[in-house]
């Protein structure tokens, strides 16, 4: 019972603390992040997800011994790239 009451008080305290220390205009920060993400989706060259590593081996090529990660494009090496 005491533990439950302490947990409730702790949660209420932490909730109040986040509201007290919150940035007054945090919605502007979120809006700027949204606009930046929108700009990157419109400009595909700016997106870092579109970068392709052409130095990897295609499936079926010999890659060596057991590895996870490069040099295989899939990331799996079991003597041949999977």
UniProtKB/Swiss-Prot annotation:
Lineage of the species this protein comes from: Eukaryota, Metazoa, Spiralia, Lophotrochozoa, Mollusca
Family membership: Belongs to the conotoxin O1 superfamily.
Pfam families: Conotoxin
Signal sequence, start to end: 1-22
Tissue: Expressed by the venom duct.
Protein name stated in the entry: Omega-conotoxin-like MaIr137
Keywords, alphabetical: Calcium channel impairing toxin, Disulfide bond, Ion channel impairing toxin, Knottin, Neurotoxin, Presynaptic neurotoxin, Secreted, Signal, Toxin, Voltage-gated calcium channel impairing toxin
Localization (cell): Secreted
Domain free text: The presence of a 'disulfide through disulfide knot' structurally defines this protein as a knottin.
Disulfide bonds: 56-73, 63-77, 72-81
Domain of life, per lineage: Eukaryota
Role according to the record: Omega-conotoxins act at presynaptic membranes, they bind and block voltage-gated calcium channels (Cav).
Organism of derivation: Conus marmoreus (Marble cone)
Major localisation: secreted
GO molecular function: calcium channel regulator activity; ion channel inhibitor activity; toxin activity
One cellular component term from this protein's GO annotations in UniProt: host cell presynaptic membrane
């Amino acid at each position: 019972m005491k533990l439950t009451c302490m947990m409730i008080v702790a949660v209420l305290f932490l909730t109040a603390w986040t509201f007290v220390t919150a940035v007054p205009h945090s919605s502007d920060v979120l809006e700027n992040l949204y606009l930046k993400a929108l700009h990157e989706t419109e400009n595909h060259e700016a997106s870092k997800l579109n970068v392709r590593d052409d130095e990897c081996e295609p499936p079926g090529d010999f890659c060596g011994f057991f590895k996870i990660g490069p040099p295989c494009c899939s990331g799996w090496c079991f003597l041949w790239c999977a």
